[in-house]
Curated annotation (Swiss-Prot):
Keywords: DNA damage, DNA recombination, DNA repair, Nucleus. Belongs to the SHU2 family. Plays a role in a RAD51/RAD54-dependent homologous recombination repair (HRR) pathway to repair MMS-induced lesions during S-phase. Required for error-free repair of spontaneous and induced DNA lesions to protect the genome from mutation. Component of the SHU complex composed of at least CSM2, PSY3, SHU1 and SHU2. It comes from Saccharomyces cerevisiae (strain FostersO) (Baker's yeast). Its main location: nucleus. This is Suppressor of hydroxyurea sensitivity protein 2. One of its GO terms (biological process) is DNA repair.
């Protein structure tokens, strides 16, 4: 799974059928299924189709009139695909846990973190395998400072706005279905984003314009 060979975000971008944007491309999906261990890709697609994924946006200025859902999608497009957002977007990626009474799962693709048990398991395994002389940063993060080696891949990329270096989390060491699912959604293409949020309406984008409700969201996650 070398970053020099494969640009995953470009493969994710081809997931929607070019001849019918209401369907996934079975060939690309089958190819990707073999590229990730533990049926990660299959579980990620199942998650995207489960109606258990939510994107909450702290919306201070949103106009409530008109088509609010489409406007929120435009906000995500500006933030993740066009880089034209005028201000830092505050958002949270949440997955509803299928176990009754379990807290919601918090996903952070910007820092490659997930609060699920699978992520914690592989993170601790990486810690145990780390030599005392090794820095955890070197074990889990691939740093590229040669511009000739820069990649256009956005999957598992940290701090994508840096112009001097590139950092990629070594996802082959730590990855879960939640991180992969949100990466497919937000690190691929506008077509893929709209496929799951608008066309199939399986991933929900919700605006919160009240700061108390926003803080309450975080309290519920912690609890």
């Amino acid at each position: 799974m070398s970053k020099d060979v494969i640009e995953y975000s470009k493969l994710f971008a081809k997931l929607v059928n070019t001849n019918d944007d209401t369907k996934l491309d079975d060939t690309i999906a089958s190819f990707l299924x073999y590229m990730f261990p533990r049926e990660l890709f299959i579980r990620a697609i199942s998650l995207l189709e489960s109606s258990d994924m939510f994107i909450y946006i702290l919306d201070r200025v949103h106009n409530k009139e008109g088509n609010e859902h489409t406007s929120l999608i435009d906000v995500l497009v500006d933030e993740f695909y066009k880089g034209s957002s005028n201000s830092l977007l505050e958002y949270r990626l949440i997955v509803k846990d299928t176990n009754d009474g379990a807290p919601x799962i918090l996903v952070d693709i910007a820092h490659w973190f997930c609060s699920c048990e699978e992520f914690c398991k592989y993170f601790h395994e990486a810690l145990e395998k780390t030599d005392e002389k090794e820095e955890l940063h070197d074990v889990l993060i691939n740093e590229v400072d040669d511009h000739l080696q820069f990649s256009d891949d956005r999957f598992a990329q940290l701090d994508p706005h840096s112009l001097s270096k590139q950092w990629y989390f070594k996802f082959d060491k730590i990855c879960c279905s939640h991180l992969l699912a949100f990466s497919i959604l937000l690190r691929s293409s506008i077509n893929v984003l709209k496929f799951f949020t608008v066309n199939s309406n399986k991933v929900f984008v919700i605006a919160i314009d009240n700061i108390d409700e926003w803080l309450n969201l975080h309290i519920n996650i912690v609890e």
